[in-house]
């Protein structure tokens, strides 16, 4: 009877820790996932980190976090690794790679959009375009880099 009680307490503690640590993951919000899918459809996706590689490295203590650039998490989660690491680290490292790719894609899209708009403005200033052509091309550029 005492053995069953200890087993039940251990199982409950493990379940509680697993559920509590789910909040430590670095997932994208639903809106960000939609944006990333749209960028991918438009061919603008930047793959800074491989999601598969991050997941595989997540099996090893801290490796997935180091790969995705989360060095502090890589070090601070080492004490937890023997207990719960193999359960959540591969998933969290993969989600972290997706997050990294999302922000890299967003930055690259903004940078390219700004560059193209600057070039367009220079063409207007040099009288190579009429104001109407400028507006039309500006809308085309904005639609190209929009995440909707």
Which sequence ranges carry the predicted segments?
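Transmembrane helix recognition focused on a "late"/terminal membrane span
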Residues: 19, 23-54, 79-148
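Short, functionally important structural connectors and interaction interfaces within domains
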Residues: 13-16, 58, 121
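Membrane interfacial helix-start motif at the N-side
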Residues: 40-49, 59-73
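Hydrophobic alpha-helical transmembrane segments
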Residues: 12, 52-56, 74-78
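Sec-dependent bacterial lipoprotein signal peptides
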Residues: 1-26
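Helical anchoring/docking segments at protein termini
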Residues: 2-3, 7, 29, 35, ...
